[in-house]
Amino acid sequence: MIPADDYPVTELTKALIARPSVTPLDEGCQTLMAERLSAIGFNIEPMVFEDTTNMWARRGNEGPVFCFAGHTDVVPTGDVSRWHTPPFVPTIIDGYLYGRGAADMKGSLAAMVIATERFVAKHPDHNGSIAFLITSDEEGPFINGTTRVIDTLEARNEKITWALVGEPSSTLKLGDVVKNGRRGSLTGNLIVKGIQGHVAYPHLADNPIHKAAPFLAELSQMHWDNGNEFFPPTSFQIANINGGTGASNVIPGALDVMFNFRYSTEVTAEILIERVEALLKAHELGYDISWIFNGLPFLTGDGPLLDATRIAIRQVTGYETDPQTTGGTSDGRFIAPTGAKVLELGPVNATIHKVNECVKVDDLEQLALCYEVILEQLLC
C-alpha cells in the first residue's frame, strides 16, 4: 500500500505549493499542469491577458464537454512568523499538508490532474471532451482571468456542458458540502454631497453625514426578499464609510459609503438599484453613485452533474453530500451564464486564507477518487 505521503496527488500538490504564485502570479504552476495533460492527449492553449496567465486545455473535439475549473493564484501569506512552517515549503505534519494554497486550491488542481490521468488510462476512448480552465486571477480583481477566457470561448462558440470548480466547498469533512449555486453580488459606491464648513457655523455648511444618517438607517433595515428553498434572503451590508478631514472643527463636504448586496434569485440587480436610488431621492439627497456587478446568482439543480457528484461522494466516502448556495462568490459565476451547469467540490475550507493553511493528506486522495468517479459517470 502506498503511504499517504507518497500519493501521486500529494506529490503534485507539494510541487504546486512550492511555486509562490501570489495573485496574479502563476510561477509555472500551469506549465507543470500542462506538461502532465499534454502527455495524455490534451491540446494546450495558453491565454495571457495583461498580467494574468490562463490556460484552456481540451482533450476531444465532441460534446458534451466536462470542464475542471480552478485557479493557481493564492492570497498573500500574511505574517510569515506566525506560520509553523514556511508557507511555500510544503510540509506534512501529523497527516496534514501545510502550505499556502494547500486547500485553496492547489490540492484540488492536483486531484483534477491525477483523476484525469487515471480516467484516460482506463477510458482512452471516452465520450465527449474533458477540459481544464485555469487562471491566475481568481484571488485578485478577476478582470483578466476566467471571464476573459469565457469571452474567448463564447466568441468561437465553444461551449462547456458541465463545469466542476475545485473551490474548497467542504465544511467538516471532505464532500460533506458541495456548492450547487451562488448568490449574486452587487457593490454600490455612494458619494453623498454636502458643503464643507466650520462646525461653529453650521448654517453656512451642509453636513452630509447628518443628511445621510436617516437614509442609511432606513436602507439597512429594508426587507429585500424572503429567499427561497435554494437561497437565503438577500443581505445588505455597509462595508466602508468615510467622511471628514480628520479635524474636529470641520464639517465634511462629502460622505463616501461602500455597500454590498448578496442577492438571491428572487430579485435582480436592476430591482436592487431601482429601490436604492428611489430611497435616495425620497430623502432628497444630493449624490453620485456607481455600481459594480460582481456576478449573477446561479443554481444547478438535479441533473447529470449533481447526480454524478452525489454518487461519487457516496461511493468514495460512504456518506451523502449536502448541496448549498451559501458563502462567497467563485469563478463559477462567469461560467454559469453561458448555460453550463456548475458545481463546486473541494477540500475542507477551515484554514483557507489563514496562516498555517493545510489540508488532510488522505482527503487529497479521496478528492481525486471523487473526481474520477464523476468523470466515469458523465463520460462513460
From Swiss-Prot:
> Which pathway does the database say it acts in?
Amino-acid biosynthesis; L-lysine biosynthesis via DAP pathway; LL-2,6-diaminopimelate from (S)-tetrahydrodipicolinate (succinylase route): step 3/3
Name the positions where Zn(2+) 1 binds. 71, 104, 167
Q: GO MF terms on file?
A: acetylornithine deacetylase activity; cobalt ion binding; succinyl-diaminopimelate desuccinylase activity; zinc ion binding
Catalytic residues (positions): 73, 138
The record's remark on the cofactor is:
Binds 2 Zn(2+) or Co(2+) ions per subunit.
- Where Zn(2+) 2 binds, per the record, is at 104, 139, 353
Q: According to its UniProt record, which reaction does this protein catalyse?
A: N-succinyl-(2S,6S)-2,6-diaminopimelate + H2O = (2S,6S)-2,6-diaminopimelate + succinate
Give a yes or no for keyword Amino-acid biosynthesis in this entry: yes
What is this enzyme's EC? 3.5.1.18
Q: Which cofactor does it need?
A: Zn(2+); Co(2+)
Q: Name its GO BP terms in alphabetical order.
A: diaminopimelate biosynthetic process; L-arginine biosynthetic process; lysine biosynthetic process via diaminopimelate
Q: Which InterPro entries match?
A: ArgE/DapE_CS, Bact_exopeptidase_dim_dom, DapE_proteobac, Peptidase_M20, Peptidase_M20_dimer, Peptidase_M20A
UniProt keyword annotations, A-Z? Amino-acid biosynthesis, Cobalt, Diaminopimelate biosynthesis, Hydrolase, Lysine biosynthesis, Metal-binding, Zinc
Q: How does it assemble?
A: Homodimer.
- Kindly give the NCBIfam families that the UniProt entry links to this protein: dapE_proteo, PRK13009.1
Q: What does this gene product do?
A: Catalyzes the hydrolysis of N-succinyl-L,L-diaminopimelic acid (SDAP), forming succinate and LL-2,6-diaminopimelate (DAP), an intermediate involved in the bacterial biosynthesis of lysine and meso-diaminopimelic acid, an essential component of bacterial cell walls.
- Family as reported in the entry's similarity comment: Belongs to the peptidase M20A family. DapE subfamily.
Q: Which HAMAP family match?
A: DapE
Q: What is this protein called?
A: Succinyl-diaminopimelate desuccinylase
Organism encoding this protein: Shewanella baltica (strain OS185)
